[in-house]
Design a protein with these regions (language model features):
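Acidic, His- and aromatic-enriched active-site or binding-groove loops in soluble protein domains
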Residues: 52-61, 227-237, 265-266, 307-322
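Divalent metal-dependent hydrolysis catalytic cores, especially in the metallo-beta-lactamase
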Residues: 28-32
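C-terminal accessory regions of radical SAM enzymes
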Residues: 260-348
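Catalytic cores of glycan-processing enzymes that make or break glycosidic bonds
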Residues: 7, 59, 63, 119-128, ...
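Conserved non-cysteine loop/helix-boundary elements of the Radical SAM core domain that shape
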Residues: 2-9, 33-53, 67-206, 210-267, ...
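Intrinsically disordered or highly flexible coil/loop and linker segments, enriched in small
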Residues: 19, 23, 60-61, 234, ...
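Structural signal for hydrophobic packing residues in well-ordered secondary-structure cores
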Residues: 14, 18, 51-55, 59, ...
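Secondary-structure boundary/capping micro-motif
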Residues: 2-17, 22, 26-27, 42, ...
Length: 348
């Protein structure tokens, strides 16, 4: 719908948030999906610059430019309507399905005739940064996602110049045997190097961690997570803690059918996640506990959308103290105005 245009993405989100009554004077930009550091540096500059430019414009200017951009894309064969786009691409899709073209060949045939004006110099980007310091909608955080093996000193310098404040990386496990069994092509030592670089360059770290991978078991998963949050080589600021779910297209399907991998029972999964929550230190936030995968697409594994609620109820039943950031937030416990006032008086 937005043609992967960062200006349009921001404009669309701002319109939706404003319509729902949200205040948008402070914005955290989160660029998810893909491997950010794999994109050419010129594209990274342009994409980031358009994020800032969309926030720097007035509401009227933003709406006007968004309309002009959508018209520009539609004239070049990228309509907003999904059915219209599918119809326009149908002949090429048929050739892809028949094995006559690869996806990349089809893309070049469809769109390479028009040069997309995606340009932003470092000076242009720095000017957008400075303008945003006094803009009505200010960026308070910029997050991108990449792989641990692409976290290098050079990549970190580029991220700092772009204005990034936090980096998401998919770790999944620190057990080298588990990593190898799941084709991760990386080691815990390289992950430790990536975490060290992120800290040295002043980034917050947000890692993705997965339980019930091929080769793991509940005991090893609990130990693996405990290492993540206690070993000084790691200690992330945030964690997305996911249970492994089987979808039809995954290679794990063969292992499932052969009986060499099975999903944890609900009792096993909840116990692993309970122990993970209890092990989480006070400087770490567990931001998510499931993936947004439709239950109809999951062949085996957790399908409960309220898994975190189930886990938190089990944590409460232990009567053990929870240090994890989200569990200690005022909103969770429903503090009264009097409680807040008393806290302010004590802090003063």
């Amino acid at each position: 719908r937005c043609s992967s245009d960062s200006f349009l993405l921001v404009a669309t989100c701002l319109r939706a948030l404003t319509a729902m009554g949200h205040v948008t004077d402070k914005v955290e930009l989160i660029v998810l999906g893909g491997t950010w550091s794999d994109y050419p540096e010129s594209y990274q500059r342009w994409f980031t610059g358009e994020l800032f430019r969309a926030l720097n414009l007035s509401d009227e200017e933003r709406v006007r430019e968004a309309t002009e951009r959508r018209t520009w894309y539609e004239r070049r064969g990228l309509p907003r309507d999904r059915d219209a786009l599918a119809a326009a691409a149908a002949p090429l899709q048929q050739r892809i399905d028949a094995g006559e073209l690869t996806y990349n060949e089809a893309w070049r045939e469809a769109y390479s005739e028009e040069e997309v004006p995606q340009s932003c110099s470092w000076d242009d980007l720095f000017a957008l940064h400075r303008a945003n310091e006094t803009a009505p909608k200010r960026v308070v955080g910029l997050v991108v996602e990449t792989r641990p093996d692409l976290v290098t000193a050079e990549a970190c310098r580029t991220l700092r110049a772009l204005g990034c404040t936090k980096v998401q990386i998919g770790i999944q496990s620190l057990n080298d045997e588990t990593l190898a069994a799941n084709g991760r092509a990386i080691t815990s030592a390289r992950i430790a190097d990536a975490m060290a670089l992120l800290r040295q360059f002043g980034f917050k770290s947000h890692v993705h961690f997965m339980v019930n991978l091929l080769g793991a078991d509940p005991v090893s998963d609990i130990a693996d997570y405990r290492r993540l949050v206690t070993d000084p080589a790691f200690l992330p600021d945030e964690v997305k803690l996911y249970p492994c779910c089987l979808v039809e297209s995954a290679q794990l399907t063969d292992c499932y059918e052969a009986g060499c991998w099975r999903p944890y029972t609900e009792e096993e999964l909840v116990e692993v996640l309970v122990q993970d929550v209890l092990a989480t230190p006070p400087w770490t936030r567990i931001s998510r506990m499931i993936r947004d995968i439709s239950a109809t697409d999951i062949l085996a594994g957790n399908k409960k959308t309220n898994l975190r609620q189930v886990v938190e109820a089990a944590v409460d039943a232990t009567d053990e103290e929870v240090a994890e950031i989200r569990s200690r937030e005022i909103s969770v416990e429903g503090a009264t105005v009097g409680d807040i006032a008393a806290g302010l008086a004590i802090s003063v």
